[in-house]
């Protein structure tokens, strides 16, 4: 029996430093990559207002376009659904005989609720997740998460001697999409939003900013800029 994975993108719109995606790439025969944007009124009561600013919409859209472009270099497209994640995932599970579901660990209450609902509604599917948003994994810490120090200084003193692991490299290849995935919709155009001249979304843009930040030695001014509320050269 073929193993078909469904990867749920959320706040990890990148291929680099994505352990869950690497896991899916190594284990699956086929792979579906999904981003579901839930703008329904019922979602607003759980997540706050679904009315995003034009700039936020533009940034998200640019990030999705960048991810879709990166996936195309692997022979993939990002499946985009404008509906609740649980509904979008369920449709793909049945239409593509999904056997495994992957995601990055999330601290979001709504995202975790959706994950739990999917696990409950699809008990025969294998669910796997990996940490990708933090410098340390819980098992790296010299204390349990429940015993987290109350102040940053105390936390820093306990963890500054821990070696930070290297970011997970992007997969060398991805399993092919299922044969009938071509009919699925990808990222739509967003022509009604005025582009921001200040911030641009996308993994490649993010890497460019990180490289520029450290190449300019800006980390050495951290103590004088860490409280800045905006600006490309502030904080880390």
Predicted regions and their residues:
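Catalytic cores of enzymes that engage adenine nucleotides and/or redox cofactors via long glycine-rich
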Residues: 161-236
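Trp/Phe/Arg-rich N-terminal binding region typifying the photolyase-homology
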Residues: 1-167
């Amino acid at each position: 029996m073929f193993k078909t994975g469904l990867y749920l993108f959320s706040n990890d719109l990148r291929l680099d430093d994505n352990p869950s995606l690497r896991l899916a790439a190594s284990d699956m025969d086929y792979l579906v990559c999904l981003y579901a944007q839930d703008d329904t009124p019922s979602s607003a009561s759980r997540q706050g207002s679904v009315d995003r600013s034009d700039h936020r919409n533009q940034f998200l859209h640019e990030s999705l376009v960048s991810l879709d472009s990166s996936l195309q270099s692997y022979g993939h497209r990002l499946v985009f659904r404008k509906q609740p994640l649980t509904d979008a995932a369920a449709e793909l599970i049945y239409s593509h005989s999904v056997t495994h579901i992957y995601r990055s660990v999330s601290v979001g209450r709504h995202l975790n609720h959706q994950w739990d609902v999917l696990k409950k509604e699809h008990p025969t599917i294998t669910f796997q997740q990996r940490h990708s948003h933090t410098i340390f994994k819980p098992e790296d810490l010299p204390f349990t998460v429940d015993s987290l120090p109350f102040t940053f200084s105390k936390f820093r003193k306990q963890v500054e001697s821990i070696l930070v692991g290297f970011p997970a490299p992007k997969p060398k290849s991805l399993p092919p999409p299922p044969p009938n995935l071509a009919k699925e919709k990808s990222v739509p155009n967003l022509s009604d939003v005025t582009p921001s001249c200040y911030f641009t979304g996308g993994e490649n843009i993010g890497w460019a900013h990180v490289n520029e930040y450290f190449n300019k030695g800006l980390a050495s001014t951290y103590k004088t800029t860490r409280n800045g509320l905006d600006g490309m050269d502030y904080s880390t």
